[in-house]
Amino acid sequence: MQWEVVIGLEIHTQLATQSKIFSGSATTFGSEPNTQASLVDLGMPGVLPVLNQEAVRMACMFGLAIDAEIGPRNVFARKNYFYPDLPKGYQISQMDLPIVGKGHLDIALEDGTIKRIGVTRAHLEEDAGKSLHEDFNGATGIDLNRAGTPLLEIVSEPDMRSAKEAVAYVKAIHALVRYLGICDGNMAEGSLRCDCNVSVRPKGQVEFGTRCEIKNVNSFRFIERAINSEIQRQIDLIEDGGKVVQETRLYDPNKDETRSMRSKEEANDYRYFPDPDLLPVVIEQSFLDSVRAALPELPTQKVERFQSQYGLSAYDANVLASSREQADYFEQVVSIGGDAKLAANWVMVELGSLLNKLGVEIDQSPVSAEQLGGMLLRIRDNTISGKIAKTVFEAMAAGEGDADSIIESKGLKQVTDTGAIDKMLDEMLAANAEQVEQYRAADEAKRGKMFGFFVGQAMKASKGKANPGQVNQLLKAKLEG
């Protein structure tokens, strides 16, 4: 039997506000446990929550960016459940009237096609605290620094049909919230976490299968592995005559499998009701207009501009626009170096390889955009060849200065003197007289392969400094003259 996979995602993004959503406590990551928890965060009696307007503004930014409906009147509700790191015994969230309604996000698939993923809603809520199990023998510690941190929970439609589509969607959300500046996207620190709802159904069946939710997956690689593992588990279970039970599961990356955590709750299990301590939030058109006016260029807009303005392929444009920092770096290189396609190649290949090797992001690059742009200028004016440029790039990465100083100190300037190249070629051809005769006796097809040998010998003789274009032109004339 052929199976179809159905995936919907809930992405929890920690908003980059200076203070928490309902209190004045700081949201700095990594502080000593319980040093950023006020009486409001601790759930002490007699204290009242006060809504952080910046969190509302950020939620509206996201909603406008995905062309979503923004609720003119939205309500905060109490989501009731017990857990040790939830001090009030309820979480302040949104249910019936969320701040962001239906929207959509377009994702680029591996084959270059674009798929539209629906967004059901995005609502504001407070994060819970954190249970610490490792440092306490036979006990659990509670850190409430995270309690009350503003979250925007982004709920997708069940529109994804493979783990790769799901990862592409999460990457698109990740890029978008970073572009907007509303979340740092640091998955290792929990700034962006994903719950994956997975089900399978026979190909052609309209009704959805029974779904299972995989909680708190925090890397792109684990999202793909967790979903694929759960897909296979469900298919194996059904084909063996069993039934999928709706439940919440956890992904174990060491065993590459999901395991049952608890039965899946429905909304009525949480007994949602409007929070009496918080008034309904009314979002006026003037507020929305001010938010819209402050929106930056979005990833999809940047991709389109990179293609039209710089003549880049869709693939190159998508790669370069995958993060705001990389896009800005690329444009800075182009503004200095001039050649967009050359800049794109160096940023994606050579710089990308260097950053991967060092394990750093582009904003920590040892080679600045000014340095790389300056080096590309020297390629374009024939001061150095592309091959020599790699030596210059390595020296810049090692902190030896800019391109001009490195070219000067290492004597890397390209030989462009026609007379000098002509003399060098004569000496090289004389030393390879037998190969010259073979070349002249060969047919056109064989000559193409043999010509590369002479080019290689010429570059070797010049220690890579001869201008390759001049070498090719003069060499062809000598061999066929």
UniProtKB/Swiss-Prot annotation:
EC number from the UniProt entry: 6.3.5.-
Ranges in a coiled coil: none
Name of the protein this chain belongs to: Aspartyl/glutamyl-tRNA(Asn/Gln) amidotransferase subunit B
SUPFAM superfamilies in UniProt: GatB/YqeY motif (SSF89095), Glutamine synthetase/guanido kinase (SSF55931)
Top-level class of the enzyme under EC nomenclature: ligase
Subunit: Heterotrimer of A, B and C subunits.
Any one Gene Ontology molecular-function term assigned to this protein's record: ATP binding
Organism: Pseudomonas entomophila (strain L48)
Intrachain disulfide bonds: none
Role according to the record: Allows the formation of correctly charged Asn-tRNA(Asn) or Gln-tRNA(Gln) through the transamidation of misacylated Asp-tRNA(Asn) or Glu-tRNA(Gln) in organisms which lack either or both of asparaginyl-tRNA or glutaminyl-tRNA synthetases. The reaction takes place in the presence of glutamine and ATP through an activated phospho-Asp-tRNA(Asn) or phospho-Glu-tRNA(Gln).
Pfam families assigned to the protein according to its UniProt record, in alphabetical order: GatB_N, GatB_Yqey
Family named by the database record: Belongs to the GatB/GatE family. GatB subfamily.
GO biological process, alphabetically ordered: glutaminyl-tRNAGln biosynthesis via transamidation; translation
Record PROSITE patterns: GATB
Catalyses which reaction(s): L-glutamyl-tRNA(Gln) + L-glutamine + ATP + H2O = L-glutaminyl-tRNA(Gln) + L-glutamate + ADP + phosphate + H(+); L-aspartyl-tRNA(Asn) + L-glutamine + ATP + H2O = L-asparaginyl-tRNA(Asn) + L-glutamate + ADP + phosphate + 2 H(+)
Keywords, in A-Z order: ATP-binding, Ligase, Nucleotide-binding, Protein biosynthesis
